[in-house]
């Protein structure tokens, strides 16, 4: 897939950050779905497994500078998973849940990354993107990753 993603970008002379998406069937055969010519919400997963800051690289390209690495330098290591934290009420058809963050305890530790602007006292408005945080966890292998991933829902406070 990596090789085909690179070929797709080269075929259209694409030189910025982007995501090539594939779908994989139960037999492991993959099919091209689309290419998004932007940084996506899930970019943190890629950053965790490659050690590359994609936002910095995108800024470098916009400034006319070359990437600070070559494709040959990119070697994925381990596995990562992203959990999105949304201010919604699942039992009410995922209705928005505005309000004030009274207590905030974010997961932390080796291989844990939290992307958020939340803080104690933050007022979540009623007109907002419901995703208020992302918890990304990286581990050497998938089993270790799933075993050590924090459970944000268990830690949530209102």
Model-predicted regions and their roles:
Residues 1-149, 153:
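ATP-dependent carboxylate activation and anion-phosphoryl transfer catalytic cores
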